[in-house]
Amino acid sequence: MNQENKVLPLIPLRGLIVFPYMVVHFDVGRDKSIEALEKAMMNDQQIFLSTQKDAKIEEPNEDDINSVGTICSIKQILRLPGDAVRVLVEGISRGKIDKYLKQEPFIEAEITEFKDEDNYEEYEIKALMRIITKEFGKYVKLSGAVTKDAVDFLKDIKEPGKFADIVSSYLIIKQEQKQSVLNSIDEKERLENVLTVIKDELQILELERNIGVKVKEKIDKSQREYYLREQIKVMQDQLGDDDEEKAEIKEYTQKIKKGKLTKEAKEKALHELKKLENAGAYSPEGAGIKTYLDWILSLPWKDKTKDNLDIKRAREILNKEHYGLSDVKDRIIEYLAVKKMSKSLKGPILCLVGPPGVGKTSIAKSIANAVNRNFVRISLGGVNDEAEIRGHRRTYVGAIPGRIIYGMKQAKSNNPLMLLDEIDKMSSSYKGESADALLEVLDTSENNKFRDNYLELDFDLSDVMFVTTANTLETIPRPLMDRMEIIEVSGYTYEEKFHIAKEHLIPKQLEEHNMPEDKKITFMDSSIYYIIENYTRESGVRSLERKIAAIIRKIITEIVEKDKSSISVNSRTVKKYLGEDVFSADKIDKEDKIGVVTGMAWTAYGGDTLPVEAVIMPGNGKLQLTGQLGDVMKESAQAGYSYVRANSVKYGIDKEFYKNKDIHVHVPEGAVPKDGPSAGVTMITAMVSALSDKKVKHNVAMTGEITLTGRVLAIGGLKEKTLAAYRAGVDTIIIPKQNEKDINKVPKAIRGKIKFILAEEVDTVLENALIGGINNDN
């Protein structure tokens, strides 16, 4: 390969690759490119053309231009109206950019020129050229984009490099493929590259031709079917077999005229009926039209149920069917009260957020019962296709409406209470964002014209009362959340679970098991508390109901086998029926200890206590963290350690303790992953206690995020954390001052038994947690 170095002006091309021996014209508009042309014309009329990697870039830098291009000779320059220039060039040889010399006022680079060698006598190269000529002939025939003269022209070319370049210039292929051929400096490699490209293109062209043949066959088939159908119609008319079909058409006509349809729906139905009449009821197309008409006629376009706006009755129903959940009940009563005054009020869109089993789904049924609306539930868990919400278009085989329209059909009224269950469990896929499809459904200003893809008709959802449920808000997209009124349904207290079990679950299970009147099962209060405390660990009451059902089944078995008339269940007999205790209640230490602090945590099943331990050992200032802590919790511990080092003197700690001591912080139950920033104050207290040799009050629990400067920041889940601490025997809780407003969410009975200490600074936490406070007379 002959090489020669040159310094040439450079023009970056957009969407065009020029090969050696190729004559082409293009327009130049960029100032730098016009300057480069003028420079080339003043010298030997040679210029280097290389293609941009991205045609959209207006001012490419060195990394945006392919390093291999073509040295060209300028044949003609034509000034166009405006500032543009049209230039005619002929490719001479390949070139590669060694380095850029300047960027202004035009791009100039040092180029290595590669000239092809005369090695066309090699047998392998001759064979490659012959195969390419044959395959290129097939390409010309199949594509129809290149004239047959091109094949004849190639037969006269002996040089392999020139042959490969000219073939490449004729091929209609992607820019990346052309650049790959241009990058091939070696002639043999270039020929192999061109052959591969041609073979790939031939496969694609062959597939295109086969597809075209199949499409034509289908069109011919449909035309033949139409002709046969017309013949069948004539024969049916002669034989009188179309009476049944006419009767069906007549029945649809009467249903459409008598049905309570909107004007648009009636017009669409009559139009489809006309198509059915033409196609024939028993044709493949007719079956799809009949299904579509059945859907239109089955929907409650104008059917409504009358709202019962009796506030007193509604409150009685809600209280009777559910214990607690006062926030939800109050919001429904408010809606009914305002609706009573203003008839045009749209239904609220409530989102009940809380852990599993707290009654989110069942309260929705009670709301429907209270306001006298039909109830329909739509489960959204696992939905990852927007067509599940909006429906599939009728062009697809087996198309059906989406879940919203299906729910309206089930409801049999256009103002039901529609429960969208587990809205946080929706996901996205290549089929579309299913959550985005709900935006129109839940937008009260737009949902009066909800359009399902299958129906292609406007359906009014504005009178629907939507209630959604979720376990967490984290996975719900923000635009969707903005359309809903969030009501948090937190876990039940022990007292609330007791009342729910006594007043709802036990009577329900006894009724489901059809207990005869002469047989009696009685649950003592102590037994209910014992089940709650030792056999369930949840925020809701699902597991509690299963345990009660298990006891009743065992008692019924005992009654049948031993012919007993009545059985009373106490805490002792619970163990007999359910086996050994599954859980033991968290209890705090009964004595004050150094480096042992009780923290508080929120879980999906409610609150829990979070003991934190810290020990000091000889070392060089390392902080070791164990207990399967998450990244946020580790960073919280690091921040706490830095704060302790910065304020060691204030707390009576040797200011150079880190030179000869290591701290190990451990959070027990190491198999359970833990994360979150709210254990910051707990970790600081454990470190200060261990370093200052001061004991921590065993009856104190705490929660709060900390900063490097010692401020205590707000946390979430205070109610659940407080309930857990109370169960464990804590009587004093230190919380961030910013959470003072959340104390009212704690049940009044428990609030009166807990002393809350509000902390804005870490000093307040340590003063109330350490025995002796934080004076430095250690």
Curated annotation (Swiss-Prot):
Homohexamer. Organized in a ring with a central cavity. Induction: By heat shock. HAMAP family: lon_bact. Residues 591-772 form the Lon proteolytic domain. It catalyses: Hydrolysis of proteins in presence of ATP. GO terms for molecular function: ATP binding; ATP hydrolysis activity; ATP-dependent peptidase activity; sequence-specific DNA binding; serine-type endopeptidase activity. It is found in: Cytoplasm. Keywords: ATP-binding, Cytoplasm, Hydrolase, Nucleotide-binding, Protease, Serine protease, Stress response. It holds the Pfam family Lon_lid. This is Lon protease. One of its GO terms (cellular component) is cytoplasm. The active site is at S678, K721. InterPro entries: AAA+_ATPase, ATPase_AAA_core, Lon_bac, Lon_bac/euk-typ, Lon_lid, Lon_proteolytic, Lon_Prtase, Lon_prtase_N. One of its GO terms (biological process) is cellular response to heat. ATP binds at G354, P355, P356, G357, V358, G359, K360, T361. ATP-dependent serine protease that mediates the selective degradation of mutant and abnormal proteins as well as certain short-lived regulatory proteins. Required for cellular homeostasis and for survival from DNA damage and developmental changes induced by stress. Degrades polypeptides processively to yield small peptide fragments that are 5 to 10 amino acids long. Binds to DNA in a double-stranded, site-specific manner. Its EC number is 3.4.21.53. Residues 8-202 form the Lon N-terminal domain. Belongs to the peptidase S16 family.
